[in-house]
């Protein structure tokens, strides 16, 4: 991703789980500073601290094998995309990303999935599920390019 604030990307929607997934998106601060942005993540102490002063909607968790929260997050995605109308959706996973990528893809919003830095030998489930709805897949390790044909190597975020 171009580090300059003058690159052609407009309003950003960041979607991720809390913890390391969120930390990797926050590490992109030089790229997103100065742009209008909105965050979707889980309400945890680390997320509240990292995103103090940011515009955030809290997602429902757990997301693994929890149909109720998948449906709630799908409603959240529809409401957020309608209200905020981002120019691009960026995510490092995990499960909360899927409804945002599917609905974003359906309405023509570009989606960027950044594979997490700690999965080098096998693809994550979220990356596999989001891949059909992903405009650009970015990886942090050269080894990850073997897992995802056509992925772009961007290097480590952390």
Q: What do the PLM-derived regions correspond to, one by one?
A:
Residues 16-18, 35-73, 143, 154-157:
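Conserved nucleotide-sugar phosphate-binding/catalytic loop shared by glycosyltransferases and other
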Residues 64-88:
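An amphipathic, basic-hydrophobic alpha-helix
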Residues 1-42, 51:
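N-terminal subdomain of nucleotide-sugar transferases
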Residues 88-107:
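An aromatic- and histidine-rich active-site surface loop
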Residues 21-24, 47, 97-100, 122-123:
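Short, well-ordered alpha-helical microsegments
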Residues 109-158:
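Active-site-proximal region of nucleotide-activated glycan assembly enzymes
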Residues 25, 93, 137:
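Residue-level signature of catalytic and energy-coupling elements of molecular machines
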């Amino acid at each position: 991703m171009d580090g300059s604030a003058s690159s052609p990307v407009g309003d950003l929607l960041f979607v991720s789980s809390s913890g390391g997934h969120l930390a990797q998106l926050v590490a992109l601060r030089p790229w997103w500073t100065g742009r209008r942005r909105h965050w979707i993540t889980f309400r945890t102490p680390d997320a509240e601290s990292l995103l103090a002063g940011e515009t955030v909607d809290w997602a429902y968790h757990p997301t693994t094998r929890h149909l109720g929260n998948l449906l709630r997050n799908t409603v959240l995605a529809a409401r957020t995309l309608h209200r905020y109308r981002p120019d691009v959706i960026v995510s490092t996973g995990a499960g909360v990303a899927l409804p945002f990528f599917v609905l974003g893809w359906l309405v023509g919003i570009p989606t960027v999935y950044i594979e997490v830095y700690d999965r080098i030998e096998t693809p994550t489930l979220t990356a596999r599920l989001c891949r059909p709805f992903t405009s650009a897949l970015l990886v942090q390790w050269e080894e990850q390019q073997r897992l995802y044909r056509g992925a772009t190597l961007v290097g480590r975020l952390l």
